[in-house]
């Protein structure tokens, strides 16, 4: 369909793009998964592997997706169609476009849980939050969890309604600096607790005894999901990027921002849990149990548990919101471009999809708890489908598009529009042709194996 009357929005400049892209990258995975994996797989060794992968694999995928978006000025579907109309190109475009549509509903459910905990801390209920069974009782009680989900979704959609520059960019410019300040405050408080130093050492000092090939696989998977690769976000944001903004420079900024926040998350959580548990690394869990069960118990044991709890869940809310905004914008962009709809109509339709699929995920722990797919509750199934299967496949299609159809030369031409030379061209060329597809295949296999319990990550 034509896009009559639809003028492409843009970010105002490099800062707007970088903070928005960094906001997309900095999400719940940085806070509830990175510290756990770093502690489990050798601390400093895991960090080193993660940084090396971010500078190679992550860098290549960010540059590729951003360049495709800016080059074509399209959403993922349009970006792929710009190079042909073959079946696999249509498949590649649509899988990259559908992923955020499926992720943002259940992500908003978790965002609703964050809203609930922030409100409870603000009301001085830290002891209740730390009680055994509080979290499971909350998510299994359909109405409160559903209301919190709707509140979070409404916040996201309100920002999307405002547009790229006045909504996404403006909110990111406010939230991201505040998020950094909050992470520093909480990390300083955490590492100065009695007994916390052992946690700092456990997190930062390399432990070769814990190093194995799984360290590389785990770091690869975390980096892949953390940088918002293969979600259609970077292609969409790239299409909003002005031609005079450096793609390589912006990518470096996003890499640094995301890695710094992940490290700060480790310093916030691991020392605090160590201080609380008496140095027991088994107290560190990944996912909701860390954030909504362990952390409240840790905060309740601290002298300033309530104010730290407020700051922490405000930080988490900002991280969740910036990611949900990016996911929703990618979905809205697809409806705008492919159906020729305006922003308001596209946002409203995405909102309906969020409400329907999100309600299924939310109620899947309560009234719909008996409904399971492949033995998984509904939220877990949507997470498995998108993260473990669709995203690695989407990444492979991007690699094939760049290396086999568009050509690295086209990417270089796009990059040279805003900078004198393609500094990491050799790295990009080798990664996009050979290593990135291979790494994505490893992530696909290991993620599926982990989901079915064949390996433990």
Predicted features along the sequence, with ranges:
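Membrane-embedded translocation segments of transport machinery
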Residues: 2-7, 11, 169, 173-321, ...
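A generic transmembrane alpha-helix motif of multi-pass inner-membrane proteins
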Residues: 379-400, 423-457
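Inter-helical loop and helix-membrane interface segments of multi-pass membrane transporters/permeases
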Residues: 5-8, 37-41, 76-95, 108-165, ...
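Transmembrane helix-boundary motif of multi-pass solute transporters/channels
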Residues: 13-53, 235-238, 249-252, 256-259, ...
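Extracellular loop-to-transmembrane helix junctions
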Residues: 38-64, 144, 390-394
């Amino acid at each position: 369909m034509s896009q009559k009357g639809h003028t492409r929005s843009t970010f105002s400049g490099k800062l707007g793009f970088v903070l928005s892209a960094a906001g997309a990258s900095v999400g719940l995975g940085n806070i509830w998964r990175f510290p756990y994996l770093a502690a489990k797989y050798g601390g400093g060794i895991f960090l080193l592997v993660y940084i090396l992968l971010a500078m190679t694999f992550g860098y290549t995928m960010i540059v590729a997706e951003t360049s495709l978006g800016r080059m074509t000025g399209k959403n993922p579907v349009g970006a792929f169609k710009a190079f042909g109309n073959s079946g696999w190109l249509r498949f590649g475009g649509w899988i990259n476009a559908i992923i955020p549509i499926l992720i943002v509903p259940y992500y908003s459910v978790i965002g609703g849980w964050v809203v609930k905990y922030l409100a409870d801390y603000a009301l001085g209920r830290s002891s209740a939050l730390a009680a055994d069974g509080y979290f499971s009782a909350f998510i299994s009680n359909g109405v409160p969890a559903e209301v919190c989900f709707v509140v979070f979704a409404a916040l996201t959609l309100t920002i999307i309604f405002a547009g790229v520059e006045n909504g996404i960019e403006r909110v990111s410019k406010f939230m991201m600096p505040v998020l950094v300040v909050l992470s520093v405050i909480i990390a300083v408080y955490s590492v100065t607790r009695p007994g916390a130093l052992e946690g700092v050492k456990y997190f930062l000092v390399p432990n070769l005894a814990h190093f194995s090939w799984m360290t590389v696989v785990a770091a690869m998977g975390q980096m892949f999901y953390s940088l918002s690769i293969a979600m259609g976000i970077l292609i969409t944001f790239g299409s909003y990027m002005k031609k005079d903004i450096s793609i390589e420079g912006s990518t470096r900024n996003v890499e640094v921002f995301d890695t710094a926040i992940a490290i700060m998350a480790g310093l916030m959580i691991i020392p605090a849990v160590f201080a609380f548990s008496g140095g027991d690394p088994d107290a560190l869990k990944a996912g909701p149990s860390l954030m909504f069960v362990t952390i409240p118990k840790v905060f309740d044991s601290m002298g300033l548990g309530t104010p730290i709890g407020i700051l922490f869940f405000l930080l988490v809310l900002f991280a969740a919101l910036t990611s949900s905004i990016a996911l929703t914008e990618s979905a809205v962009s697809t409806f705008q471009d492919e159906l020729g709809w305006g922003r308001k109509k596209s946002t409203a339709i995405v909102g309906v999809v969020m409400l329907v699929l999100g309600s299924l995920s939310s109620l899947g722990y309560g009234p719909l708890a008996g409904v399971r797919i492949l033995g998984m509750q509904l939220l877990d199934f949507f997470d498995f489908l998108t993260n473990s299967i669709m995203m690695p496949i989407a990444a492979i299609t991007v690699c094939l598009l760049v290396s086999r159809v568009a050509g690295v030369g086209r990417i270089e031409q796009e990059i040279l529009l805003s900078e004198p030379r393609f500094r990491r061209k050799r790295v990009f060329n080798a990664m996009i042709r050979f290593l990135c597809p291979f790494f994505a295949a490893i992530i696909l296999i290991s993620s599926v194996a982990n989901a079915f319990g064949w390996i433990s990550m």
